[in-house]
C-alpha cells in the first residue's frame, strides 16, 4: 500500500502497449520470481512467510545481506560497488496484513522481482568504473494493525525510514518500484517525485522504445517508500500506477499482471541507471 494524498482519488485510464525494444531485462525470470513469492501466500512484516522470502532473496542479490530495521524486521540489500554517491533501486517485499489472503502480486511481488532482475541485468551491463549501485528490498512498508491513515508515514515505511536514516550521506538518488506490472500500465510522474530525475527516466524510456508507458502529466502525491529519502534531501522517484483497480484487494493476483509492462519498466530503469552510473 501507498497512501494517496488527493481528495479526488488517484485513478486514471488504462491502455495497452508492448515491452521494451532493448533486450537486457528478463521479464520471464522476473515473473518466475513473482510466482515464487505468491506461492508463499500472504507475507506481512514479521511473518514466517516473509522470513522465508527474505532468506531466498538475499541469495539473489550481489553481496546480499540483511540490514536491521527496528521491531525485529530486516531489509534485504545488495551492492554493485563503485564510487559514490550511490544509486539506490528499491521496492518493498512485504504485503498488507489485511484482508486475510492478500498476496500482493502487483503491490510487493512485482517490484521485488523487478529489483532482483535489475541486479542481474546491471551486473552484466554496467561498464568498468561505474558508480556504486545498490538494491534494497524494504521490510515493513505496509502499515501495522491499528495504524490510522493520518499516521501512515510515522508507523509504516519502516524499512525505508531505517535505510534513509542510516545511509543518507552516502546516497545520490532513489528509484522506487511499486505498482509496475499491471495490465494497461501507465506511469505519469507521481506528485512527490523529483521532476528532473523523472525527466531523465522519460528520456531513457524513449531510448528503449517504451515512452508510451511514461506519459506526460502528473499523478497526485503519494506517501510511499521514497518519502523518507526526499525528506533527507535525496532526489527520489516513485514508479507507481495508482490507477490499478485491484490495489489493496484480494484480486491483486498474478492474472492481473502483464509481462510486457514489467519488461518496459525494467528496460527503462536499466537504461536510466546505466546512463547515470557510467563515468
Model-derived regions: residue spans:
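Acidic/histidine-rich catalytic neighborhood of metal-dependent amide-processing enzymes
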Residues: 103-204, 221
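A non-catalytic alpha/beta surface segment that caps or lines the substrate-entry region
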Residues: 12-23, 32-83
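Structural recognition of the beta-strand scaffold that forms the well-ordered cores
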Residues: 77, 86-90, 134-137, 172-178, ...
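Active-site-adjacent substrate-binding region
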Residues: 42, 173, 180-279
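Solvent-exposed loop/turn segments at secondary-structure junctions
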Residues: 43-45, 70-71, 83-84, 93-97, ...
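C-terminal motif of bacterial Sec signal peptides marking the signal peptidase cleavage site
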Residues: 5-9
Amino acid at each position: 500500500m501507498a497512501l494517496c494524498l488527493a481528495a479526488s482519488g488517484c485513478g486514471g485510464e488504462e491502455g495497452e502497449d508492448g515491452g521494451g525494444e532493448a533486450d537486457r531485462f528478463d521479464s520471464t525470470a522476473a515473473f518466475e520470481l513473482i510466482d515464487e513469492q505468491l506461492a508463499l501466500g500472504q507475507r506481512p512484516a514479521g511473518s514466517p512467510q516473509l522470513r522465508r522470502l527474505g532468506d531466498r532473496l538475499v541469495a539473489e542479490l550481489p553481496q546480499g545481506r540483511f540490514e536491521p530495521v527496528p521491531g525485529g524486521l530486516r531489509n534485504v540489500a545488495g551492492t554493485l560497488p563503485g564510487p559514490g554517491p550511490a544509486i539506490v533501486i528499491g521496492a518493498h517485499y512485504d504485503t498488507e496484513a489485511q484482508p486475510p489472503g492478500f498476496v500482493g502480486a502487483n503491490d510487493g511481488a512485482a517490484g521485488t522481482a523487478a529489483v532482483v532482475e535489475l541486479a542481474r541485468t546491471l551486473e552484466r551491463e554496467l561498464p568498468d568504473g561505474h558508480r556504486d549501485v545498490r538494491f534494497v528490498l524494504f521490510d515493513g512498508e505496509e502499515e501495522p494493525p491499528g495504524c490510522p491513515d493520518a499516521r501512515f508515514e510515522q508507523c509504516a515505511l519502516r524499512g525505508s525510514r531505517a535505510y534513509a536514516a542510516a545511509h543518507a550521506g552516502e546516497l545520490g538518488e532513489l528509484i522506487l518500484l511499486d505498482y509496475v506490472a499491471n495490465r494497461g500500465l501507465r506511469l505519469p510522474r507521481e506528485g512527490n517525485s523529483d521532476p528532473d530525475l523523472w525527466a531523465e527516466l522519460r528520456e531513457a524510456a524513449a531510448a528503449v522504445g517504451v515512452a508510451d508507458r511514461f506519459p506526460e502529466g502528473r499523478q497526485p502525491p503519494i506517501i510511499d517508500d521514497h518519502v523518507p529519502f526526499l525528506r533527507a534531501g535525496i532526489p527520489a522517484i516513485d514508479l507507481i500506477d495508482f490507477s490499478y483497480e485491484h490495489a489493496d484487494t484480494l484480486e491483486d493476483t498474478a492474472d492481473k499482471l502483464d509481462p510486457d509492462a514489467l519488461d518496459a519498466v525494467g528496460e527503462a530503469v536499466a537504461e536510466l541507471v546505466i546512463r547515470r552510473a557510467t563515468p
